[in-house]
Amino acid sequence: MARRGKKYIEASKLVDRNKRYTLEEAVDLLKKMEEVLQRRFDETVELAMRLNVDPRYADQMVRGSVVLPHGLGKPIKVVVFAEGEYAKKAEEAGADYVGGDELINKILKEEWTDFDVAIATPEMMPKVAKLGRILGPRGLMPSPKTGTVTTNVEQAIKDAKRGRVEFKVDKAGNVHMPVGKISFEKEKLIDNLYAAIDAVVRAKPPGAKGQYIKNMAVSLTMSPSVKLDINEVLKKLQEKAA
């Protein structure tokens, strides 16, 4: 097990391991940790959720996407697999890379994945399917469930550039996603966190039984995690929706 540095240990002391925090308290703690850790880069704030599902069963799979209200705080590179009129629309909408067979072959030959989001028109998917072994493990494969297989390429590009985050439960029932940078104002981080949690709640599959969310925590890229009070967070979500 890797040894923790002095600053990490100091940051850990800020967290009460026996307490479950509100989102507001947790973001305040992350801000304090950032001051202690003194990283030389703008750390990403990450959300982790442990769900009471078994993704081996189709009716317990959790997958979706969310457009964070305040984005991710970084430029998003978008690839669009399209031809003809759709390719023209994608270029006009600001896609970073647009193409058909040539772009697909480039990814196949070079295993090139220097982009954050991949979008495809439905007619391109039989060809894009060949990229599954490359794009799939990196979470880049276009999917109708996340809105990245569509004829409305302009809207998909707009959402991606704004900071749409895709999520998918792993084999152990965990969901991880970035929700912004620690340099964001507190309220913007809180807004993004509520939006992300709400998206996972709405993605609850029909086969999920009992308490859907078992654990929830936030952290920086390289910091201790802060566990959240699930009931309090869900209560606030309901109040926001009312």
From Swiss-Prot:
One of its GO terms (molecular function) is rRNA binding. The keyword Ribosomal protein applies. The keyword Transferase does not apply. It comes from the Bacteria. GO terms for biological process: regulation of translation; translation. One of its GO terms (cellular component) is large ribosomal subunit. It holds the Pfam family Ribosomal_L1. Gene3D superfamilies: 3.30.190.20, 3.40.50.790. CDD domains: Ribosomal_L1. InterPro entries: Ribosom_uL1_bac-type (IPR005878), Ribosomal_uL1 (IPR002143), Ribosomal_uL1-like (IPR023674), Ribosomal_uL1/biogenesis (IPR028364), Ribosomal_uL1_3-a/b-sand (IPR016095), Ribosomal_uL1_CS (IPR023673). Keywords: Repressor, Ribonucleoprotein, Ribosomal protein, RNA-binding, rRNA-binding, Translation regulation, tRNA-binding. Belongs to the universal ribosomal protein uL1 family. Binds directly to 23S rRNA. The L1 stalk is quite mobile in the ribosome, and is involved in E site tRNA release. Protein L1 is also a translational repressor protein, it controls the translation of the L11 operon by binding to its mRNA. Part of the 50S ribosomal subunit. This is Large ribosomal subunit protein uL1. The gene is rplA.
